[in-house]
């Protein structure tokens, strides 16, 4: 067996698959080390991809030729655009997935990836020399050599499952934890913490009274995640919606002392935006009920995931809870819910490339960095995989910043501010969300992927064709003009100022949509619906986008002021508090320094002035010298 690679990726979850595929797409000889290939692409918690903020990440992964979007399209059994009635910036694509179809599609994608080999085994020890990673040792003693290593262990690092008063070591249900790597991290001096997440019981859908619950259909037609998916062909299903009742809350209150979160058995923090049902009852006791989404786990699988009642209460208490919920009174519980604690690395130990500051060539992605969610993991995996391949080949790393995409927002949040609870992506975290929309992820990122070399020929050809069609349609819309009097004859009420307005101008009005301008100018009928949608969104946002472009330019100026070699003791005027924070966190740029807690605008001004003075001191370079 070959034992030398450019990049080794540890873990076959959502982060690991994207990391391995991304590294391989850049031409790196890549090994994906996982316990069992059969678990690659497993959806450990909810059987769904996307959502608010999360759907943006899936589209961005797809724009860089990642796997998740296409795999979700292959496995999706209900697609919905969340926030459809709101503006395009906050709409979030989401898909309910068939677990088996999703995992099978991901495994097929991994098998089909050139330069990628899967090795079954448990990574036990990191090997390093002179401050650089050199490879890994497996639990069976095998050693693998590599120029870079990406670790994506999910909840497996010293994982501990809790169910009522019981607890036992596990990475997820029925799978062993990873124990050796945490010791390797501690030996390197990496700061570790503990986090907690949980999952609800699984139900037998054949025993649910579906007539007693509200049914929720998906969108028709379903909208794919990937621009390379022409249409969704998998059969689509409906989900159910029910609610807890006061009787449910009474059962929980009577037994909350048996929850590991409230008995003191679990000390670590769980995800604020995905609380357990016992947490909801304790913290929001004034509510009459809490919504539960009944999500089928597959087309030929009777298992149902009750989204909204994550719990680690004892098994018999979980049964008692279910018996009080409309539609679930007689349901059979196939598996109880549980909580899991696991180690994570303080993400402030990382560079924006996701390389650790303490050991060159070591990259971390996914829940190990304190995030929660498949989509957050996938986006980090892609970035880590790209950078690992670039580093192994002796190249410069790539940084995605807050103006590039949600993946840049997430990574900057992690490496700058750190986390005190599992980090989840929301649209509200992005300052530039008018430009960082789910619908334009490919327009923002695919050219960057082409420059990096991580985008394949199929996507490259599609992208060139789409961008040409978009430019042509926009130019056409801007070339067709009409007077207010002419518009009135078509039923459009405009200010009678005598000014001619283009079709693009008309689309900027909130009440005017593409079908109305197409009715005026028949030549617009040749524009495809998807391209027309992009033109209309650009028109609606045009004024606001101009302002945001100026904001992004100011942001980029601050991001261009590098602080990597600054000795803060030599910067006059900084307060001791600011100096201490800057020394401790070592921000890359003035922009990143400004996002640290306790760094004031005055301190930023001092830093910018210092950098300008230092730049003036450097000798000018004359062409031809040196």
Curated annotation (Swiss-Prot):
Q: Which InterPro entries does the entry link to?
A: FAD/NAD-bd_sf, GIDA_C_N, MnmG, MnmG-rel, MnmG-rel_CS, MnmG_C, MnmG_C_subdom, MnmG_C_subdom_sf
Protein's cellular compartments: Cytoplasm
Q: Which cofactor does it need?
A: FAD
Domain of life (superkingdom): Bacteria
Q: What UniProt keywords apply to this chain's record, in alphabetical order?
A: Cytoplasm, FAD, Flavoprotein, NAD, tRNA processing
Question: A Pfam family this protein belongs to?
Answer: SAM_GIDA_C
Residues annotated for FAD binding in this entry: 11-16
Q: Which PROSITE patterns match?
A: GIDA_1, GIDA_2
One GO biological-process annotation of the entry reads: tRNA methylation
Q: Name one GO cellular component term.
A: cytosol
Q: Which GO molecular function annotation, any one, does this entry have? A: flavin adenine dinucleotide binding
Recorded family membership: Belongs to the MnmG family.
Q: What is this protein called?
A: tRNA uridine 5-carboxymethylaminomethyl modification enzyme MnmG
Which taxonomic lineage does the organism of this UniProt entry have? Bacteria, Pseudomonadati, Pseudomonadota, Alphaproteobacteria, Hyphomicrobiales
